[in-house]
């Protein structure tokens, strides 16, 4: 009985064990455990990390520049980009993990970014797309964006039939000179004067630009339409957003029609002499 009481007394009088805080325990375990390796890519745990990371970057660009105007179907076909093939992309996009559907997804997003109006693209889009061009076409694929010269002028060249025109367009009061002469003095026909003014009427800017044109070759109609073509191209430099409106009006596309040549045995290109029985 006494031995039991003595044991209880000793246990009661013994000092309590020291309690360690959570911070002390955590510091000890943190020092003992090895450092955790952080994945380089945020898509590390996906089936194809390299491809998914590139898709994420392209999606980020599309969301950022989704409001920029795009080219129409005809212009997109003319400026179709030569992208790298499936085998070439597999070297940087996951190797054997890459699937044809993933490559198709990549091409769709690349074409969406490439079809943005070239006048509005920037270095961020260009540098991202340059990774996917074929090496042989990297140098020839640089798009030169026209800008105003040091005097604030937009310079463009237009052609029609055998006529060629070079125009200088600057913001002003609406003065138009052709080969150093007034428009009414150089073109006597009302139709020729109207064709020159047509691009300005399309964008509702009559009287807002001064135009100085030099033209040579062909007749009055060919010279007037070559000046019209050059003015339309020069106006796009001032405001690239006008390109779609001028293209719909048909003044940005060169008219390649020519007078058909005369054939032997005929009076003109198609006209035959009157047939007489005898």
Curated annotation (Swiss-Prot):
| Stated name of the protein | Small ribosomal subunit protein uS9m
Query: Which PANTHER family does the annotation name?
Result: RIBOSOMAL PROTEIN S9, SMALL RIBOSOMAL SUBUNIT PROTEIN US9M
Region annotated Disordered, chain positions:
259-278
On whether Transit peptide is a keyword of this UniProt record, the answer is yes
Q: Which organism is it from?
A: Saccharomyces cerevisiae (strain ATCC 204508 / S288c)
Quaternary structure annotation from Swiss-Prot or TrEMBL: Component of the mitochondrial small ribosomal subunit (mt-SSU). Mature yeast 74S mitochondrial ribosomes consist of a small (37S) and a large (54S) subunit. The 37S small subunit contains a 15S ribosomal RNA (15S mt-rRNA) and 34 different proteins. The 54S large subunit contains a 21S rRNA (21S mt-rRNA) and 46 different proteins.
Function according to Swiss-Prot or TrEMBL:
Component of the mitochondrial ribosome (mitoribosome), a dedicated translation machinery responsible for the synthesis of mitochondrial genome-encoded proteins, including at least some of the essential transmembrane subunits of the mitochondrial respiratory chain. The mitoribosomes are attached to the mitochondrial inner membrane and translation products are cotranslationally integrated into the membrane.
Please indicate if the UniProt record lists Ribosomal protein as a keyword: yes
